[in-house]
Design a protein with these regions (language model features):
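Catalytic binding pocket for nucleotide-activated donors in carbohydrate/polymer assembly enzymes
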Residues: 71-199
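Phosphate-/polyanion-interacting regions in eukaryotic proteins
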Residues: 1-70
């Protein structure tokens, strides 16, 4: 059985890849402190235990239902002093946009990353939170007790975003990445009008 036998499937638990459900648990246990919810399209009744790769911990966390929400515009984030940034199935692309807001970001330890993550520093650009969110309450209490330091973290994140995450700098990153990859090609690329485009 398993991945190598006649029945193919995922071997091992996958609950660790659904951290947004853990934020819902914090909402239920600390109303007013954490405001997390689930959009209707995130929960599919079609996904059964077999498809999730069942284990007891996953079952508990997937049953933790936060309040159902309607999708709000990104500008709604401007009303919060703190933002909790957790991954989805991979790194969430929202972080760059959230950093522009100047709010203090509580960023979950991530198993995946975007191109700018190596430049970020915990306690300088964000408040680090364990992947399990087990220390979220502790970090929230720290931020409330050290409001000035927490606000400064948000300001530094905003300054970082303005310098490194604007349209021009992101385009520069992609230009350099694709140029470096082009140098590694062991062949000359085909060009011409018959391909439907012309190189600049």
């Amino acid at each position: 059985g398993g991945c190598n036998g006649p029945t193919r499937g995922w071997r091992g638990p996958i609950w660790q890849f659904y951290p947004r459900k853990r934020a819902n648990i914090h909402t239920a246990s600390r109303p007013g402190a954490v405001d997390a919810g689930t959009y209707d399209h995130c929960d599919s009744p079609k996904l059964n235990k077999h498809e999730w790769g069942w284990d007891a911990e996953m079952e508990k966390e997937m049953r933790a239902r936060g309040p159902k929400r309607k999708i709000e515009p990104f500008a709604a984030n401007c009303g919060y002093r703190y933002l909790l940034h957790v991954d989805g199935n991979v790194a969430s692309s929202r972080l760059a946009s959230e950093m522009h807001l100047g709010a203090t970001i509580f960023k979950q330890d991530s198993f995946s990353s975007e191109h700018f993550y190596p430049l970020l520093r915990p306690w300088r650009h964000y408040v680090p939170v364990d992947r399990s969110l087990a220390d979220l309450d502790e970090k929230y209490r720290w931020a409330n007790a050290n409001a000035r330091e927490a606000e400064e973290i948000g300001r530094r994140a905003q300054a970082f975003a303005r310098e490194h995450l604007h349209t021009g700098s992101v385009a520069c990153y992609w230009w350099q990445l694709l140029s470096a990859l082009a140098d590694l090609q062991p062949f000359a690329p085909r060009t011409g009008a018959d391909l439907g485009f012309r190189p600049a």
